[in-house]
């Protein structure tokens, strides 16, 4: 898997890009392809349920539920079957630093960084091939933001997922394998130099 960055200032087209790849909007021109098929030719409901997970800047968690319940609901909605669901969820949350005592707190009681980690686990457990994160460090302090980007990098490389970070932050883009810079709604590709990847 690889981690990609979509880098752009406000108004550059990042939100439109997110709407297009998630199937919330249709392209007026051209087409978006997934596994050699246009998104217009496949069931968008199935695509979003089985292949794409989005981590929103505002986390989009159910604040009246616990961290554990938030992840459990995502697993059920996705239809992913796990042998020992309880252990799978508990271990997935622990792997990002959400201890068992935190797992049983309502997410509204967790810090911003903890909520973002829960949102990342919600995306991970769905089995989606592609995880898109919208401004993943927008509401976080610098250190927590760095931890979240490292977590996405680990997901991309260890779990062989495609991770797409949509951001205005050049430092985040530098951590990605490939960056596409959006300027005036046009993509400009920047690949890491070999010396940077070692």
What are the roles of these predicted feature ranges?
Residues 30-38:
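Conserved ABC transporter NBD signature motif
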Residues 106-110, 114-116:
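Conserved ABC ATPase signature
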Residues 127:
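Conserved catalytic motifs of ABC-family nucleotide-binding domains
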Residues 65-73:
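Short coil-to-helix segment of the ABC ATPase nucleotide-binding domain corresponding to the Q-loop/switch region
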Residues 83-101:
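Conserved ABC ATPase "signature" region
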């Amino acid at each position: 898997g690889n981690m990609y960055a979509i880098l752009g200032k406000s108004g550059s087209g990042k939100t439109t890009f997110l709407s297009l790849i998630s199937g919330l909007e249709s392209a007026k021109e051209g087409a978006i392809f997934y596994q050699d098929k246009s998104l217009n030719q496949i069931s968008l409901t199935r695509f979003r349920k089985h292949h794409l997970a989005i981590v929103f800047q505002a986390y989009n968690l159910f604040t009246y539920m616990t961290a554990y319940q938030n992840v459990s609901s995502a697993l059920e909605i996705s239809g992913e079957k796990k042998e020992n669901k309880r252990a799978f969820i508990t271990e997935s949350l622990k792997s990002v630093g959400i201890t068992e005592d935190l797992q049983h707190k309502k997410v509204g009681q967790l810090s911003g960084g903890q909520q973002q980690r829960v949102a990342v686990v919600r995306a991970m457990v769905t089995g989606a091939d592609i995880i898109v994160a919208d401004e993943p460090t927008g509401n976080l302090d610098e250190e927590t933001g760095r931890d979240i980007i490292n977590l996405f990098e680990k997901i991309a490389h260890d779990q062989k997922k495609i991770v797409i970070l949509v951001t205005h932050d050049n430092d985040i883009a530098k951590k990605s394998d490939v960056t596409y810079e959006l300027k005036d709604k046009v993509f400009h590709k920047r690949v890491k130099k070999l010396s940077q990847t070692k």
